[in-house]
C-alpha cells in the first residue's frame, strides 16, 4: 500500500510552530524510505501522521490530505480497517508495551489475539517473529525486566507478527548493538522485498545507508531534499542544511576544509569508498 501526503500541515496543541508545513510526499510499497533531519525537523510527526496516530492519539490539528490507499488514517472510522496493516515502532519502545502481558510470548501475541487469530496460528507466528529478530530465547521473560536492546527487539517482533503492509519506524535500532542493528536493518529490507512500504526515521546514517532506496531530508516540517541516499548525502545542499552524514562522509568533509583538493570527485560515504578514492589519487 502507498502512503500519500498532499499539502499536509500539523500542529500540536501547545506548540508554537507547526511540526509539518504544507508537506507533500509519498511512501511506496516495496521501498525503504529514510527520513533524515535535525531534531525537531518533523520526522517523528510525519511517521505519526502516516499511521493516523497524529491527531487521533496525540491531539493537535491537521490540514491537508493523508491517504493509505483511499483511506484517511486520521479518521477514527478507518481504524478497524487498518488494524494489523500498520507496524509502528516508537523511539521509546517501553511505551508500546501492553501492560497486560506476563511474558514476552504474551506481549507479541497480544495484537493477533485481539484480531481474533486462532491459537495455533498465534503460536506459530509469534515464535517465527521472535526468531527473526533473534529473540526466541526471551519467550518466557517478563517484558518489564528486559534490557533496552531486548525490549526493542520484542517490540519489533510484536509488529512483525502481523506482517504489516506499512512499517513506520522511529529510531528502531537505537538500543541495539552493532551486529543486532545490522540484522534489524536487513530485516526491514526483507520486509520491503515482501512488498511492504518501509519508512525509517533515524539519525543512524551509517546503519541505514546500505538498505535505504530513498532519503527524504526534512527541514522545519518541510521536504528539503528527496532522492537516492548516496547522491543526497554527498551533496553540498545536504551539508548546508547541517543534518550531518555518515561518519566517513563527515570526516571527509572536515578534511576538505584543510585540503580543498580532496573535495574533487565527490564525497565518499563509506570506508570502502574512501579507501578506493585515496588509492586512485
Predicted regions and their residues:
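Catalytic Walker B motif of ABC-type/P-loop ATPase nucleotide-binding domains
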Residues: 167-170
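ABC ATPase NBD Q-loop/coupling interface
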Residues: 65-81
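H-loop/switch region of ABC-family ATPase nucleotide-binding domains
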Residues: 202-203
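The feature captures the beta-strand-to-loop junction immediately N-terminal to the Walker
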Residues: 36-38
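Conserved ABC ATPase signature
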Residues: 142-146, 150
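Conserved ABC ATPase "signature" region
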Residues: 120-138
Amino acid at each position: 500500500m502507498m502512503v500519500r501526503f498532499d499539502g499536509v500541515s500539523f500542529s500540536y496543541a501547545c506548540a508554537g510552530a507547526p511540526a509539518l508545513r504544507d508537506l507533500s510526499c509519498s511512501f511506496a510499497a516495496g521501498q525503504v524510505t529514510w527520513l533524515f533531519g535535525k531534531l525537531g525537523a518533523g520526522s517523528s510527526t510525519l511517521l505519526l501522521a502516516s499511521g493516523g496516530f497524529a491527531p487521533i492519539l496525540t491531539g493537535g490539528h491537521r490540514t491537508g490530505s493523508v491517504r493509505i490507499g483511499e483511506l484517511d488514517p486520521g479518521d477514527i472510522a478507518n481504524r478497524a480497517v487498518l488494524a494489523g496493516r500498520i507496524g509502528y515502532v516508537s523511539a521509546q519502545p517501553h511505551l508500546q508495551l501492553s501492560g497486560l502481558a506476563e511474558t514476552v510470548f504474551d506481549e507479541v501475541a497480544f495484537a493477533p489475539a485481539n484480531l481474533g487469530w486462532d491459537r495455533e496460528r498465534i503460536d506459530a507466528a509469534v515464535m517465527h517473529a521472535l526468531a527473526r529478530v533473534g529473540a526466541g530465547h526471551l519467550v518466557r521473560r517478563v517484558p518489564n525486566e528486559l534490557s533496552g536492546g531486548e525490549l526493542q527487539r520484542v517490540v519489533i517482533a510484536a509488529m512483525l507478527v502481523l506482517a504489516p503492509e506499512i512499517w513506520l519506524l522511529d529510531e528502531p535500532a537505537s538500543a541495539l548493538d552493532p551486529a543486532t542493528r545490522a540484522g534489524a536493518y536487513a530485516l526491514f529490507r526483507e520486509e520491503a522485498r515482501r512488498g511492504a512500504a518501509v519508512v525509517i526515521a533515524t539519525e543512524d546514517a551509517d546503519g541505514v545507508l546500505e538498505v535505504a532506496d530513498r532519503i527524504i531530508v526534512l527541514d522545519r516540517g518541510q521536504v528539503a531534499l528527496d532522492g537516492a541516499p548516496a547522491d543526497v548525502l554527498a551533496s553540498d545542499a545536504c551539508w548546508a542544511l547541517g543534518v550531518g552524514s555518515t561518519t566517513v562522509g563527515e570526516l571527509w568533509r572536515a578534511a576538505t576544509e584543510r585540503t580543498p583538493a580532496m573535495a574533487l570527485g565527490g564525497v565518499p560515504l563509506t570506508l570502502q569508498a574512501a579507501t578506493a578514492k585515496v588509492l586512485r589519487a
